[in-house]
Amino acid sequence: MQKLQLCVYIYLFMLIVAGPVDLNENSEQKENVEKEGLCNACTWRQNTKSSRIEAIKIQILSKLRLETAPNISKDAIRQLLPKAPPLRELIDQYDVQRDDSSDGSLEDDDYHATTETIITMPTESDFLMQVDGKPKCCFFKFSSKIQYNKVVKAQLWIYLRPVETPTTVFVQILRLIKPMKDGTRYTGIRSLKLDMNPGTGIWQSIDVKTVLQNWLKQPESNLGIEIKALDENGHDLAVTFPGPGEDGLNPFLEVKVTDTPKRSRRDFGLDCDEHSTESRCCRYPLTVDFEAFGWDWIIAPKRYKANYCSGECEFVFLQKYPHTHLVHQANPRGSAGPCCTPTKMSPINMLYFNGKEQIIYGKIPAMVVDRCGCS
């Protein structure tokens, strides 16, 4: 009996002495595991963020049908960018892409960008150079995007130089045609009379939708136009070939097109920030800065909120995917399981130069992650 009591005392003594040591070790081990888990999660998110940025660059070029980023310098952009009302309004009203995903709707966009507005600058034409033995303005080449979309508006914008006294200006837009037997090379498109006051020059728009539609139906008839804006003394006030101090005052065409709207569906998901300890699949903030890429060819936005998905898709949380859970139970080693991916994405509007130095305002689908989920 005394031997049994002695064994019990020894056992209790060992529990008292050794117990706290074991608890401290377990606590330290648990803390180390938690720190290691958080560190791994941060590293994983950083890698995911970097991959997302590279993927965005590739997607933008692909969706805009560009093999490489247009090589346009800042100086060239200052010269090409029209100082005209429609473009200034787009830029002035532009803001960083808003993170507005509260409606929970998902657009089933086509892969390629949906163009809304195309601003086309004039280019040189051999035919124009031959008329009267001197250069004429203007010849416009049209993007294939205009060919395959419905044109709802087409405006020719011209800039008139300032006058010193109140002046009546006669504006005439002529369409070039193949020389006729009587030598005629022009046919009238529009004529209008303007009263100009002294001061700064003005921008004037002229509706050319019908002419554009005819050009699209018969591309061979597009030989260019000539612009005249004569004052009472016969001086031409239209800026067709900008001189010193007239950068950004070239004539240009503003063409608006529309596409069929897409249907929508609903979805939900978790939102986290960079300091979150959430391990499950979650949406994290990510701002893409185009200036950091050196992409000066993107006029607006200069940056936008793209967001990205990161986190685990543990099978214990997968009541939403019973078929995947059953597959995992049947073959746990052979099933990779669902991944944390975007389940809701929305487009961004973008104003940019394409490879032909045309200014395009369009909608690029699926560029903002609004919701993340396991799929």
UniProtKB/Swiss-Prot annotation:
<dbReference type="GO" id="GO:1902725">
    <property type="term" value="P:negative regulation of satellite cell differentiation"/>
</dbReference>
<keyword id="KW-0325">Glycoprotein</keyword>
<dbReference type="GO" id="GO:0043539">
    <property type="term" value="F:protein serine/threonine kinase activator activity"/>
</dbReference>
<feature type="site" description="Cleavage">
    <location>
        <begin position="98"/>
        <end position="99"/>
    </location>
</feature>
<dbReference type="Pfam" id="PF00019">
    <property type="entry name" value="TGF_beta"/>
</dbReference>
<dbReference type="GO" id="GO:1902723">
    <property type="term" value="P:negative regulation of skeletal muscle satellite cell proliferation"/>
</dbReference>
<dbReference type="GO" id="GO:0005125">
    <property type="term" value="F:cytokine activity"/>
</dbReference>
<comment type="function">
    <text>Acts specifically as a negative regulator of skeletal muscle growth.</text>
</comment>
<dbReference type="GO" id="GO:0071549">
    <property type="term" value="P:cellular response to dexamethasone stimulus"/>
</dbReference>
<keyword id="KW-1015">Disulfide bond</keyword>
<dbReference type="GO" id="GO:0045662">
    <property type="term" value="P:negative regulation of myoblast differentiation"/>
</dbReference>
<feature type="disulfide bond">
    <location>
        <begin position="272"/>
        <end position="282"/>
    </location>
</feature>
<dbReference type="GO" id="GO:0010592">
    <property type="term" value="P:positive regulation of lamellipodium assembly"/>
</dbReference>
<keyword id="KW-0339">Growth factor</keyword>
<dbReference type="InterPro" id="IPR001111">
    <property type="entry name" value="TGF-b_propeptide"/>
</dbReference>
<dbReference type="GO" id="GO:0014839">
    <property type="term" value="P:myoblast migration involved in skeletal muscle regeneration"/>
</dbReference>
<feature type="glycosylation site" description="N-linked (GlcNAc...) asparagine">
    <location>
        <position position="71"/>
    </location>
</feature>
<dbReference type="InterPro" id="IPR029034">
    <property type="entry name" value="Cystine-knot_cytokine"/>
</dbReference>
<feature type="disulfide bond">
    <location>
        <begin position="281"/>
        <end position="340"/>
    </location>
</feature>
<comment type="similarity">
    <text>Belongs to the TGF-beta family.</text>
</comment>
<dbReference type="GO" id="GO:0010759">
    <property type="term" value="P:positive regulation of macrophage chemotaxis"/>
</dbReference>
<dbReference type="GO" id="GO:0046627">
    <property type="term" value="P:negative regulation of insulin receptor signaling pathway"/>
</dbReference>
<dbReference type="GO" id="GO:0008083">
    <property type="term" value="F:growth factor activity"/>
</dbReference>
<dbReference type="GO" id="GO:0008201">
    <property type="term" value="F:heparin binding"/>
</dbReference>
<dbReference type="Pfam" id="PF00688">
    <property type="entry name" value="TGFb_propeptide"/>
</dbReference>
<dbReference type="GO" id="GO:0051898">
    <property type="term" value="P:negative regulation of phosphatidylinositol 3-kinase/protein kinase B signal transduction"/>
</dbReference>
<dbReference type="GO" id="GO:0014816">
    <property type="term" value="P:skeletal muscle satellite cell differentiation"/>
</dbReference>
<dbReference type="GO" id="GO:2000818">
    <property type="term" value="P:negative regulation of myoblast proliferation"/>
</dbReference>
<protein>
    <recommendedName>
        <fullName>Growth/differentiation factor 8</fullName>
    </recommendedName>
</protein>
<dbReference type="InterPro" id="IPR015615">
    <property type="entry name" value="TGF-beta-rel"/>
</dbReference>
<dbReference type="GO" id="GO:0042803">
    <property type="term" value="F:protein homodimerization activity"/>
</dbReference>
<dbReference type="GO" id="GO:0005615">
    <property type="term" value="C:extracellular space"/>
</dbReference>
<dbReference type="InterPro" id="IPR001839">
    <property type="entry name" value="TGF-b_C"/>
</dbReference>
<keyword id="KW-0358">Heparin-binding</keyword>
<feature type="disulfide bond">
    <location>
        <begin position="313"/>
        <end position="374"/>
    </location>
</feature>
<dbReference type="GO" id="GO:0042802">
    <property type="term" value="F:identical protein binding"/>
</dbReference>
<keyword id="KW-0732">Signal</keyword>
<dbReference type="InterPro" id="IPR017948">
    <property type="entry name" value="TGFb_CS"/>
</dbReference>
<keyword id="KW-0964">Secreted</keyword>
<dbReference type="GO" id="GO:0046716">
    <property type="term" value="P:muscle cell cellular homeostasis"/>
</dbReference>
<comment type="subunit">
    <text>Homodimer; disulfide-linked. Interacts with WFIKKN2, leading to inhibit its activity. Interacts with FSTL3.</text>
</comment>
<keyword id="KW-0165">Cleavage on pair of basic residues</keyword>
